[in-house]
Amino acid sequence: MTTGGHGTDGVERRGLMFVLSSPSGAGKTTLSRLLIERMPGLRMSVSATTRPMRPGEVDGRDYLFVDKPRFEAMVRDDELLEWATVFDNRYGTPRAPVEAALSAGQDVLFDIDWQGTQQLREKARADVVSVFILPPSAGDLEKRLHSRAQDSDEVIRKRMSRASHEMSHWAEYDYIVINHDVDEAFAEVQSILKAERLKRERRIGLVGFVRGLQGQLQG
């Protein structure tokens, strides 16, 4: 039996997996943060990773930091919904907490690349809503990468080279947002999430709700 939580109108619904992907520097991390801050009922998926912890990060909040043998065991035991290798580090989404959230009617936000999105679709297509964020220009993307001041020139060159390959998968996504301005891009992404929450097939309580209305009218 499918379970779910209640939307703002009181109708029970199943949660969804809301995916944001983009080349590094196109704005998906900022947009993800704004969504978590401003959209009730949305929680961030916490990925497992083999990369080293960065200053200010907290294990279990930002990522689940694991070593390579543990990550390989998670892949082998089908504990991950998706996983990918990025710049020699592995990232993956633990299955159990996501499935529990969806069943409770909570939406889960994913900040993952095209490989992870493809794997999510293969395992749970009906639950996935995907958005690809594009920069307004290549020059703007490079400027943003330099302004972050967290990567060397060599790493930035690699990210720019990888960006073209990542963008080649744009047509695999449900929605495309061009991030000219972060406030405008956020408004567009927020509108997508609000509309997807109202999809008939996710609102599993509608059958009972409509029958109740019909009963009132016929009584």
UniProtKB/Swiss-Prot annotation:
Q: Does the keyword Kinase apply?
A: yes
Q: Which residues form the Guanylate kinase-like domain?
A: 15-194
| Protein localization | Cytoplasm
The GO terms this record gives for MF are: ATP binding; guanylate kinase activity
Q: Does the keyword Manganese apply?
A: no
What PROSITE patterns has UniProt attached to this entry? GUANYLATE_KINASE_1 (PS00856), GUANYLATE_KINASE_2 (PS50052)
Signal peptide bounds: none
Predominant location of this chain?
cytoplasm
Keywords assigned by UniProt, alphabetized: ATP-binding, Cytoplasm, Kinase, Nucleotide-binding, Transferase
* Binding of ATP, residues: S22, P23, S24, G25, A26, G27, K28, T29
**Pfam families in the record:** Guanylate_kin
InterPro entries in the cross-refs: GK/Ca_channel_bsu, Guanylate_kin-like_dom, Guanylate_kinase, Guanylate_kinase_CS, P-loop_NTPase
Q: What is this protein called?
A: Guanylate kinase
Q: Which species does the entry assign this protein to? A: Bradyrhizobium diazoefficiens (strain JCM 10833 / BCRC 13528 / IAM 13628 / NBRC 14792 / USDA 110)
